[in-house]
Amino acid sequence: MLSFSRVVNCSRTCSRFLGLSLGTASLCAAGANIALLFPNWDVTYLMRGLIGKHAMLGSGLWGGGLMVLLAATLISMTGSFSKSAPCLQVLIALLSSGLALLGAVICFVTSGVALKDGPFCMFDVSSFNQTQAWKFGYPFKDLHNRNYLYDRSLWTSVCLEPSKAVVWHVAFFSILLCISLLQLLLVAIHLVNSILGLFCSFCEKH
């Protein structure tokens, strides 16, 4: 009886820690997505509508951010429902896990696609008469013979504006990718912790 009680208490403490960790990760994801809206901390690109679709989608704000933050709040409150019915505890665990899982997956997929397509920037488009023309777009999206992620020479030679567009894009979307992976790991731990805690609660009552 004592061992089951200790496991249950440990599970509740772990839930609070997981909730705090997920909440912190969600705020970091939101911060990274906000940074992507202001290349080089310049607001003019956002005002002119020259921000890439992946950053404008805001998956780090509402997916890895708000959805995970709501789930983290539910997870942290798990200890408050310690005397409630097991069915309610199961419902809260499933709801919080599903919400965090969905938000993290959305952020992960969007970040992966963004890294694959490359940054939205101004680049040189050579016409048939060899005159120079510039436009905003995704210069690396259809570059099949070279991968810009591994070819650092392309980082400074292709995108003309914003300056260091590739570095900014790769850095913050990589951060979002890592944060979403961490969130997925924390959700998996939360599921295991919830199942263990509920099992021990049943054993403790019987």
From Swiss-Prot:
* GO biological process entries: positive regulation of osteoclast differentiation
The knockout note for this entry states: Knockout mice are born at the Mendelian rate and show no overt phenotype. Animals exhibit higher bone mass compared to that of wild-type animals of the same age, because of impaired osteoclast differentiation (multinucleation). When fed a normal chow diet, knockout mice show normal body weight, fat tissue mass, adipocyte size, or body composition. The knockout does not affect energy expenditure, food intake, physical activity, nor fecal lipid excretion. When fed on high fat-diet, knockout animals show reduced weight gain compared to wild-type littermates.
Q: Does the keyword Ligase apply?
A: no
Q: Where is the signal peptide?
A: none
Query: Its induction, per UniProt?
Result: Up-regulated in gonadal white adipose tissue after high-fat diet. Up-regulated by oxidized LDL in RAW 264.7 cells, a macrophage cell line (at protein level).
Tell me yes or no: is Nucleus among this UniProt entry's keywords: no
**Which key words are in the record?**
Cell projection, Cytoplasm, Cytoskeleton, Glycoprotein, Lysosome, Membrane, Transmembrane, Transmembrane helix
Give the residue ranges for region: Important for homodimerization. Answer: 182-192
Residues that span the membrane, as ranges = 17-37, 55-75, 90-110, 172-192
- Protein topology in the membrane: Multi-pass membrane protein
Which residues face the membrane's Cytoplasmic side?
1-16, 76-89, 193-206
Native source organism of the sequence: Mus musculus
Where does it live in the cell?
Answer: Lysosome membrane; Cytoplasm, Cytoskeleton; Cell projection, Filopodium
Please identify the protein, giving its name as recorded: Transmembrane 4 L6 family member 19
- Subunit structure as annotated in this protein's UniProt entry: May form homodimers and homooligomers. Interacts with integrins ITGAV and ITGB3. Interacts with components of members of the V0 complex of vacuolar(H+)-ATPase (V-ATPase), including ATP6V0B and ATP6V0D2; this interaction inhibits V1-V0 complex assembly.
